[in-house]
């Protein structure tokens, strides 16, 4: 669900290029999605993590060899009310606030079973989210809550607001603040960073995460075709346009002349 925006864009262009191919995509939370993959209810998933060792071992015992296709680097983005006093935090400050309600901050997420939740639990080293976390039904509700509450911080995938050409993105970012974070214990080196595309390179922004297609069919089918499309030139340009960092970056040649214009020649 958290990466629905990029998946929908890839699906639309894929079916436009291959009109006889039809994808049946269901959006759900990451925890349930992996559970369904393990019992063969679904053949292909798009997720923010690889299969872990336990899941891989389970599938191997069933003679299944799933294939992973990395296609983008995204990030967990933090947003706050426009009137919030602070717009930048050290990594250590943010992890402390996530794990301890004493700060008085409320954290708002889209789904308690999402991949974002799993990553937060790893950060704070706890089995469950603390009481100062609220789970809402949609990203739209998260945005509305942040606009109405000065002490709240929303946690979303950056893909939801990464496309700078999107009217929706411009509207949201005009009403909330995108927070900046330092890297762990080295804020002097890089300062405070927002999850912009250029900060995803080399993982300068501390809350980056990879996006994967995982296919469990073991055969060449429409799912493999879709994964190949996403990792190919067109699919990677869609990733770039969405504000994320493509895993496979195509070469672009620029021609410079004695003029103020720059021409892309390839």
Language model segments and positions:
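Generic hydrophobic, aliphatic-rich segments that mediate packing or membrane embedding
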Residues: 33, 72-74
């Amino acid at each position: 669900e958290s990466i629905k925006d990029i998946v929908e864009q890839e699906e639309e262009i894929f079916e436009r290029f291959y009109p006889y191919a039809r994808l049946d995509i269901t959006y759900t939370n990451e925890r349930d999605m992996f559970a369904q993959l393990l019992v063969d209810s679904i053949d292909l998933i798009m997720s923010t993590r690889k299969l872990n060792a336990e899941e891989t071992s389970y599938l191997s015992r069933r003679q299944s060899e799933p294939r992973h296709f990395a296609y983008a680097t995204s990030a967990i983005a933090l947003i706050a009310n426009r009137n919030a006093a602070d717009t930048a935090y050290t990594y250590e400050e943010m992890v402390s606030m996530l794990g301890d309600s004493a700060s008085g901050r409320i954290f708002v997420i889209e789904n308690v079973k999402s991949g974002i939740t799993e990553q937060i639990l790893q950060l704070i080293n706890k089995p469950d989210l603390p009481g100062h976390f609220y789970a809402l039904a949609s990203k739209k509700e998260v945005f509305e809550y942040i606009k109405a509450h000065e002490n709240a911080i929303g946690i979303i995938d950056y893909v939801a607001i990464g496309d700078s050409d999107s009217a929706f993105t411009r509207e949201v970012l005009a009403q909330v603040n995108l927070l900046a974070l330092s890297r762990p214990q080295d804020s002097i080196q890089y300062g405070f960073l927002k999850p912009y595309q250029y900060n995803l390179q080399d993982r300068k922004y501390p809350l980056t995460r990879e996006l994967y297609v995982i296919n469990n069919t073991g055969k060449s089918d429409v799912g493999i075709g879709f994964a190949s499309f996403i990792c190919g030139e067109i699919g990677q340009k869609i990733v770039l346009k969405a504000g994320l960092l493509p895993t496979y970056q195509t070469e672009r040649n620029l021609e410079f002349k004695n003029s103020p214009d720059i021409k892309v020649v390839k």
